[in-house]
Amino acid sequence: KTTSTYTVACQQLLNPIAGSDVSFKEEWWNEWEIRPYTLNAYIMCDPAHSRKKGSNRTAIAVVGIDANYNKFLLDGVCHRLSLSERWEALKMFRTKWKRAPGIREVKIGYERYGAQSDIEHFKEMMRIDGSSFPVYELNWTGGGGSQSKQDRIQRLEPDLKDGSFFFPFPTDEKRLTSHQKDYKIKKQEFLISKKILRKNEEGKVYDLVDWVKKNEYMLFPTIHPDFLDALSRIYDMDAMPPISRTRRSLEPDAEARY
């Protein structure tokens, strides 16, 4: 993997300032039209504990890992959520992706800072719902504050630069690409990328991927790069590629269209 510019600045140039203003380049933004059939899915939550305007947003990112360690943004949310809304969102994403064809494993990680009371609430809700699943605390040894968040996010750079991190293509269902049409004919529409449309705390619908690209990715380091921070937590999840359940697959995996 390529070493990040930030790491080079810190380790070789002995000058972290030289790398601190590094932004993510537009040409590093790669999109997927068709996801690989077999993936492990990781749900990472970076919670915000205020719904006040101008405060940080709760970011939940669902990232799939394929057999080659490529990473695919599959789903998510980025707006202000109450504790009960965070629980409902996590439960929804877990249920959705455990049921999705080809998904081998689903794990949930939750930002450790301030997480204990949240996780206690989740355990109580599981008891009430009659369900149980682990929520892993995501630790970070680099301290706190905005600089720490920037350091975490910088870990995305090598994968972005190498072309191994992919965002959903903004599919228009009325104008499918030729590759997507092939999968529709094969009745595998579930592998086709879709816009991730969410409704924020004000009831307004937003396109998650478009919002993240314009407000976080292209402006990094920005004031509130909440979703990028959640994405970077994939490196704290001990994420592993999926292991085939059979020695010889009866049907070959779909090739991802990048």
Segments and roles (model prediction):
Residues Q12, L156, A230:
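A residue-level signal for conserved active-site and pocket-lining positions in enzyme catalytic cores
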